[in-house]
UniProtKB/Swiss-Prot annotation:
The keyword Lipid metabolism applies. It is found in: Cytoplasm. GO terms for cellular component: cytoplasm. This is Phosphate acyltransferase. GO terms for molecular function: phosphate:acyl-[acyl carrier protein] acyltransferase activity. The keyword Lipid biosynthesis applies. It comes from Bradyrhizobium sp. (strain ORS 278). Disulfide bonds: none annotated. Keywords: Cytoplasm, Lipid biosynthesis, Lipid metabolism, Phospholipid biosynthesis, Phospholipid metabolism, Transferase.
Length: 353
């Protein structure tokens, strides 16, 4: 019998804290029974939720702390106030100590990235982490990064993101040489700012064995599945993510309004109910919730702060799968195949939320 995956949860993170984290963990456990949980947070708030889920309670250990990182805390403030004591820090530290295989938090993005970087440290050759997520496309799925861990970055940073993203895609999709594209305002070589053009030149010149660089990808190419990995710096990546989530919700509302507009539309819906249900599920952002903080000596997953239990369960699933497939080892192996791809670059600004 395989060893259980141990997941550390920041039970106080996100907009709703334990009232979403605990039910979400219970849903995840039902789908992945070979899981154990460390729950960090206020035991007085965790216990009532845990009592409603006996199966989860049986495989969980609560570690009390009444210190939680606020959504309004800047990364520097969170580090000063919550280092060593907050539920977010303690969940990350459990990974560092080997008590957990992965940490999951729905808390403040900037604080999470800062704490994870400070506690776990970056991998050799990686100057700063990135947020990567699995993005549903018309061709299947793609990996997109950086979705907001840091803002800005030079060509070296974009090349490092390409290497890490290709390693993640290789693990997830079983492709030894995934395709990689740089997000840009056009596919022509002269388009974009100097940093992205320089990164493109470096990727072409390096001809890395672990990835197939295909050139620039426009914004609509993400959803089309133009590349297995789409790379951008965190500011543009976060805008793309929020725009896609908003569009999915908008399309769902448009469909609901069209169906309710007339009797004939409602009758037609009855005949196509299965197709509409499949479309709604496909557009549901909760299914894609959970971004991996890549580039660290440990696995950390960021959940959306405003998600519900089902969405948080998706983030836990991402963490489970990253631990099960031994992502960290495979990223290290990929990075070691090219020591020069991840040269240091100037320090970036704080993460976006």
């Amino acid at each position: 019998m395989p060893q259980k995956v141990r997941i550390a949860l920041d039970a106080m993170g996100g907009d709703f804290g334990a009232s979403v984290v605990i039910p979400g963990a219970a849903i995840a456990l039902g789908r992945r029974p070979d899981t154990e949980f460390l729950l960090f947070g206020d035991s007085a708030k965790i216990a009532p939720q845990l009592d409603q889920h006996p199966r989860l309670k049986a495989v969980s250990r609560v570690i009390h702390t009444d210190v939680a990182v606020s959504n309004d805390d800047k990364p520097s403030q969170a580090l000063r106030r919550g280092r060593k004591t907050s539920s977010m820090w303690l969940a990350i530290e459990a990974v560092k100590k080997g008590e957990a295989d992965v940490a999951v938090s729905a808390g403040n993005t900037g604080a999470l990235v800062a704490m994870a970087r400070f506690c776990l440290r970056t991998l050799d050759g990686i100057d700063r982490p990135a947020l990567a997520a699995i993005w549903p496309t018309t061709r299947g799925e793609s990996v997109v990064l950086d979705l907001g861990a840091t803002i800005g970055g030079d060509a070296h940073h974009l090349v490092a993101l390409s290497v890490m993203g290709s390693a993640l895609a290789s693990v997830l999709f079983g492709k030894p040489k995934p395709t990689v594209g740089l997000l840009n305002i056009g596919v022509e070589e002269m388009k974009g700012h100097e940093e992205i053009r320089e990164a493109a030149e470096q990727l072409r010149a390096m001809n890395l064995p672990q990835l197939d660089y295909i050139g620039f990808v426009e914004g609509d190419g993400i959803g089309k599945g133009a590349a297995d990995v789409v790379v951008t710096e965190g500011f543009s990546g976060n805008i793309a993510l929020k725009a896609a989530e908003g569009t999915a919700r908008q399309v769902t509302e448009f469909l609901r309004g069209a169906i309710q507009a007339s009797l004939m539309a409602r009758i037609g819906y009855l005949f196509a109910r299965g197709a509409f249900a499949a479309l709604r599920a496909r557009l549901d952002p909760r299914r894609s919730n959970g971004s991996v903080v890549l580039g660290l000596k440990g696995i950390v997953v960021k959940s959306h702060g405003g998600t519900d239990a089902e969405g948080f369960a998706s983030a836990v699933r991402v963490g489970y799968e990253m631990a099960r497939c031994d992502l960290l080892t495979k990223i290290n192996q990929t990075l070691n195949r090219d020591g020069g791809a991840s040269a240091s670059e100037p320090v970036a600004q704080e993460a976006v939320s």
